[in-house]
Amino acid sequence: MTLKELLVGFGTQVRSIWMIGLHAFAKRETRMYPEEPVYLPPRYRGRIVLTRDPDGEERCVACNLCAVACPVGCISLQKAETKDGRWYPEFFRINFSRCIFCGLCEEACPTTAIQLTPDFELGEYKRQDLVYEKEDLLISGPGKYPEYNFYRMAGMAIDGKDKGEAENEAKPIDVKSLLP
């Protein structure tokens, strides 16, 4: 080993210790999570929930568009129908161990039943616990759209009433009439 190699080695050791000393007093970037709140952007996409309409009924009509739009196939559901003709999911299941939180299911939902919340604490010890059923996903409120009701907006027929007899609905137009 030459004197030059010895001085270069000693210089790198001194430089390393100097850098450690500089970084020891620098401001920390690590957040102490439970004590310090985490900043979430306004459009953060977290846990998926199923919402209710203003009347308290489930918004989901089991159209299956969310399952078709999901790129990883983590949503599964089965349609059922009530006595008054309203559709609802008999079961609704999301596997959060596969979900990539892309938000395509929320965009595809015509009833705004599926909504992504800013909740990000989904840690579990067993993978089976990340499969959420309808009871786990359904919340008591309307979520982001408190006044929206799919059955009122879509003009779905109401049992016992003809078209045009429902609340705030105009009578149907007779297209064969010559009257203005």
From Swiss-Prot:
Membrane topology reported for the UniProt record: Peripheral membrane protein
4Fe-4S ferredoxin-type domain location: 50-80, 90-119
Swiss-Prot/TrEMBL keywords: 4Fe-4S, Cell inner membrane, Cell membrane, Iron, Iron-sulfur, Membrane, Metal-binding, NAD, Quinone, Repeat, Translocase, Ubiquinone
SUPFAM superfamilies: 4Fe-4S ferredoxins (SSF54862)
Catalyses which reaction(s): a quinone + NADH + 5 H(+)(in) = a quinol + NAD(+) + 4 H(+)(out)
InterPro entries for the chain: 4Fe4S_Fe-S-bd, 4Fe4S_Fe_S_CS, NADH_quinone_OxRdtase_chainI
Cofactor names: [4Fe-4S] cluster
Pfam families linked: Fer4_7
Residues bound to [4Fe-4S] cluster 1: 60, 63, 66, 109
Keyword Lipoprotein among record annotations: no
GO CC terms, sorted: plasma membrane; respiratory chain complex I
One GO term of the biological process aspect: aerobic respiration
Binding-site residues, [4Fe-4S] cluster 2: 70, 99, 102, 105
GO MF assignments: 4 iron, 4 sulfur cluster binding; iron ion binding; NADH:ubiquinone reductase (non-electrogenic) activity; quinone binding
EC number: 7.1.1.-
Localization in the cell: Cell inner membrane
Cofactor binding note from Swiss-Prot or TrEMBL: Binds 2 [4Fe-4S] clusters per subunit.
Family: Belongs to the complex I 23 kDa subunit family.
Oligomer status and interactors: NDH-1 is composed of 13 different subunits. Subunits NuoA, H, J, K, L, M, N constitute the membrane sector of the complex.
Function: NDH-1 shuttles electrons from NADH, via FMN and iron-sulfur (Fe-S) centers, to quinones in the respiratory chain. The immediate electron acceptor for the enzyme in this species is believed to be ubiquinone. Couples the redox reaction to proton translocation (for every two electrons transferred, four hydrogen ions are translocated across the cytoplasmic membrane), and thus conserves the redox energy in a proton gradient.
Matching HAMAP family: NDH1_NuoI
Name of the protein: NADH-quinone oxidoreductase subunit I
Organism: Salmonella typhimurium (strain LT2 / SGSC1412 / ATCC 700720)
Chain's gene name: nuoI
